[in-house]
């Protein structure tokens, strides 16, 4: 199945949240599928909130890394999702999808990332391939509107990325700090 599924009784609310499924991880979770408020106490199922679910599980070349073909297809399928919305992006294996939203921001901005990894390493696959571990580096190198990245939570040993970049636009707050 591919496409968009709206969860809600009538029309889409002014402030829906968006779930992007790449692995099918949400299929076994019920918090976003409840039909009635009584079915869950989850905050995402309160009146006035709608879930827009975008199924991208049929896109190959997207697990851990993003091939050029997968990136093109994801950009098409995610074009309906506003940048300034709440996005649930599958698992950490697909962190790079954040870059697809960041590249649509057309004014100066800062990135605040809470993660155990910096996600700003050069691709282990070479050739500048976009991966779940390299998307912040891609953003810093290619998005002129990204003025600062604040990374909160990387392991102390992940400071190798900071040495690699020597970029004054990055602020680190490691897990030990």
Short names for language-model regions:
Residues 3-177:
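Conserved alpha-helical scaffold segments that buttress catalytic/binding sites
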């Amino acid at each position: 199945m591919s496409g968009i599924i709206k969860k809600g009784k009538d029309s889409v609310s002014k402030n829906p949240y968006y779930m992007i499924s790449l692995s099918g991880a949400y299929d076994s979770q019920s918090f976003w599928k409840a039909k009635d408020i009584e079915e869950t106490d989850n905050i995402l199922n309160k009146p006035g909130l709608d879930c827009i679910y975008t199924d991208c599980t049929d896109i190959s070349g997207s697990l851990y890394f993003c091939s050029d073909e997968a990136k093109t297809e994801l950009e098409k399928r995610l074009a309906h999702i506003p940048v300034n919305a709440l996005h649930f992006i599958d698992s950490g294996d697909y962190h790079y999808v954040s870059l697809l939203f960041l590249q649509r921001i057309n004014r100066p901005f800062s990135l605040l990332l809470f993660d155990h990894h910096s996600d700003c390493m050069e691709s282990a696959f070479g050739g500048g391939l976009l991966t779940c571990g390299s998307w912040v580096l891609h953003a810093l190198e290619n998005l002129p509107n990204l003025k600062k990245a604040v990374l909160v939570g990387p392991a102390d040993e992940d400071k190798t990325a900071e040495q690699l970049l020597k970029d004054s636009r990055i602020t680190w707050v490691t897990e030990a700090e």
